A protein has these predicted regions:
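Active-site SXXK
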Residues: 51, 56, 78, 95-121, ...
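A short, well-structured edge-of-sheet supersecondary motif
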Residues: 59-90, 327-330
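Structured C-terminal helix/loop/strand segments within mature extracytoplasmic catalytic/sensor domains
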Residues: 314-385
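Active-site Gly/Thr loop motif
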Residues: 231, 279-330
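Peripheral terminal and inter-domain segments
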Residues: 365-516
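Catalytic-site signature segments of enzymes, centered on catalytic residues
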Residues: 91, 160-248
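Active-site-proximal alpha-helical segments within enzyme catalytic domains
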Residues: 199-206, 244-267, 318-335
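Active-site helix/loop module of the DD-peptidase/beta-lactamase fold
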Residues: 115-156, 182, 213-250
Length: 516
């Protein structure tokens, strides 16, 4: 079991549940009872050998810690035993899975090898790009293989470790593939793990070079189609190559399908979608990832935990966890700040795995199931609370227009409108109105252009007066990990605004003054 489990363990839960962590259960044998191509069948946890009471404790812990989870799905023996969404998310909302995209790219490379598009993992990367003039070229760079890309051991100088501060420079470049190929080497290929989303992007470029279609098109034909997965968008680089290491959107149910495919050795309803030997090889440790925040092993774009499960992991807390010896798939989508990134794995080890009691059904426990349903409702955060009376400042600033000083966000004007006894307010930025819930419930807003951050998704917003002169707005672009808090501090003729992005904690300070 990895050190990070112990580091991030919930202390009270350890004491209460430590004995349950020793439980083991054999997976279900034989052919799955059905295939969820058209949709998941649901079941109580007890019907699939799991203890609802432990899952109730998990949701209690999530609420107490206030983890910024967007969804939690648990599949046992092929049945969806737990499905929870935090509003405004639901089962139909595609979520940016960030670096879970890497595991999808890995599957597509395996399929491409099986179909003969790629000769094998030993094929040299530069062979796919013969027309490119590559900087810093030497024999070591010429020796980089597809396997080196798959195992994050290409040797490219890619500073910053798992958080990859180089990504900004990379994505601002005119040609993302060329940027990676031109990087000097810091290590001989195959010798050291260095997390590198650019290397994963080269895998997508290789797919497009060899198949003649984009990774998304290849996936729709060979992976998503057979599983009944309907992907959201998949961002592309300036040359139209789907980003190999991030920015694919899937619903949590479709994320679970992908995990279930791997749980079943790449086989789906009689079709070998991903070669079985590729699944086995991909989810086997090829290199240690020590010293780069994550301490366990790495396969072919999959994280391998010493406890016996493997994971696709994405920025902000996107998880697809496959636990073969429990016949279990677990999915989390999130907007977790960096310090809480491992919270889903803590929840897995503290509550979900101990909930697996048997490979056979347990005795019914309707009271615990009812408590679990109540916990899922609480998790949704859709219950409105009473709206406190407005402070005098709200009446004073309502309807006033403020002009921003020059700022990096490009904002020019701000207006707020409040009404006594209303459960919403309106915040208008640069002429775009946002309805903001004042009763702790988010309100959804379509925006004609990116307004907060660089996402063009609908924005969910809620707000509250923190004091007589300070109003805070939580803004969540729906479908991405990032969320934002705007803290507005008013005085007689101006407002000072602190804008904070909640995953990284980075922020900006702005000032706006009343228009004369």
């Amino acid at each position: 079991m990895s050190y990070r489990f112990w580091r991030w363990m919930l202390p009270v839960a350890v004491i209460v549940l430590a004995s349950g962590m020793l439980d083991t259960s054999a997976p279900a044998q034989g052919t799955p009872p059905y295939w969820p191509t058209e949709g998941w069948r649901v079941s109580t946890p007890e019907e699939q050998g799991m203890d609802s009471a432990r899952l109730v404790a998990m949701f209690d812990a999530v609420e107490k810690a206030d983890y910024a989870l967007h969804s939690v799905l648990i599949v046992r023996h092929g049945y969806l035993v737990t499905e929870a969404y935090r509003y405004p998310y639901d089962q139909a909302t595609p979520h940016d899975v960030r670096s879970c995209t890497k595991s999808v790219i890995s599957a597509l490379i395996g399929i491409a090898i099986q179909q003969g598009h790629v000769a094998g993992v030993d094929q040299r990367v530069l062979d796919f790009f013969p027309e490119r003039a590559v900087a810093n070229l030497d024999d070591a760079k010429r020796s980089i293989t597809v396997e080196n890309l798959l195992t994050m051991s290409s040797g490219f100088d890619w500073p910053g470790g798992i958080l990859e501060p180089i990504l900004g420079e990379w994505t601002r470049s005119d040609n993302w593939v060329q940027f990676v190929l031109d990087r000097p080497l810091a290590d001989p290929p195959g010798t050291r793990f260095v997390y590198n989303t650019g290397g994963s992007h080269l895998l997508s470029a290789i797919l497009q070079e060899t198949t003649g279609v984009t990774a998304l098109e290849f996936a729709q034909q060979n992976l998503f189609g057979p599983l009944g997965i309907s992907p959201g968008r998949w961002e592309s680089d300036p040359q139209g190559i789907n980003v190999g290491g991030a920015w694919l959107r899937l619903t949590p149910r479709d994320m679970a399908k992908f995990g279930y495919l791997y749980l079943n050795g790449g086989q789906w309803d009689g079709q070998q979608v991903v070669p079985a030997d590729w699944v086995a090889t991909s989810t086997h440790e090829h290199i240690r990832a020590g010293g780069q925040w994550l301490s366990d092993g790495y396969g072919y774009q999959w994280w391998i935990d010493q406890a016996g499960y493997y994971m696709a992991l994405g920025y902000g807390g996107q998880y697809i966890v496959v636990v073969p010896d429990r016949d279990l798939v677990v999915v989390f989508t999130s907007g977790l700040p960096t310090q809480d990134f491992f919270a889903p794995e803590t929840l897995l080890n503290t509550f979900i795995l101990p909930a697996v009691q048997s490979s056979a059904p347990l005795s019914p426990n309707p009271a615990a199931v009812a408590d679990l349903e109540a916990g899922i409702r609480t998790f949704a955060h859709r219950e409105a609370s009473a709206v406190p009376p407005l402070p005098e400042t709200a009446r004073r600033v309502s309807g006033q227009v403020y002009a921003f000083d020059p700022n990096d966000e490009g904002w020019e004007s701000l207006r707020l409108d409040f009404a006594d006894e209303a459960d919403t307010a309106q915040v208008t930025l640069d002429g775009i109105p946002l309805t903001v819930g004042l009763d702790r419930v988010f309100r959804l807003n379509d925006t004609p252009r990116p307004l907060i951050g660089y996402w063009d998704d609908p924005v969910a917003a809620r707000g509250a007066w923190k004091s007589d002169a300070v109003f805070a707005v939580d803004a969540q672009p729906v479908g991405v990990p990032e969320s934002y808090t705007l803290t507005l501090a008013f005085d007689s003729a101006e407002v000072r605004i602190r804008l904070r992005e909640n995953v990284t904690g980075r922020g900006d300070s702005l000032k706006a003054s009343l228009r004369g």
